[in-house]
Amino acid sequence: MRMIASHNIFGVFAHHRAQCEGIAKAVKVLLNAVDIKCIVVTGESVKNGKKVPHAWNMVNIDGQPYHLDVTWDIGAIGSSFKRIPYDYFNLSDQLIIKEHKADTQLPTCSSMRHNYFAVNKNTFWMKNRALAYVEKALQNGDTEFYFRIEGDNVAFDVAESVYHHLKDIFSEKGITDKRIKRIANNYVGTCCIKIY
């Protein structure tokens, strides 16, 4: 019974466990209930070089379609950072096709206007802008920095640059009791850096 439930909304709401299909169906029900158009997309995903069947969502916001993969956000950086990640929140085709392939033809998703990072103004085109964002946030007392960098396969390098920049700042100030953790997703360009 649990195996069947994991592929539908019952698994999500009754057992708090589900496979991607159950999660995508639950997202559809919840978003449709608040008048956000949403469909379940089936296809395959590639993670660590393996292709596996997968389901995610396509939402329509202000007349623009976006890909939304709550399953992958649940399993992304949040577990190690104790936070809710938004790596796969309202993506364009250009980003989603790096790891997802739909079984059927879908509407073209070309906008990033309602992407989590665009809405929060945490998308940067250059490394120095990301560094400036981190420095300003650090001055404001923030200890966690979550942003997106444009460009192919640059997130890891930017996260490393921020990491070393923060280490230099701490070294200059004689701070020795701080640790820095960083995680980057090169596929969608997200970086999460935490000082603890």
Regions found by a protein language model. Name each.
Residues 1-12:
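Secondary-structure boundary elements
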Residues 11-12, 92-196:
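N-terminal accessory/pre-domain segments preceding catalytic cores
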Residues 21-94:
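Hydrophobic/aromatic-rich core segments of domains that either
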Residues 3-5, 21-25, 110-111:
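Generic detector of short, locally flexible boundary/turn motifs and exposed helical patches
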Residues 14-22:
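Soluble non-cytosolic domains of exported or imported proteins
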Residues 1, 69, 185-187:
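Acidic/polar residues at beta-strand termini and the immediately following turn/coil
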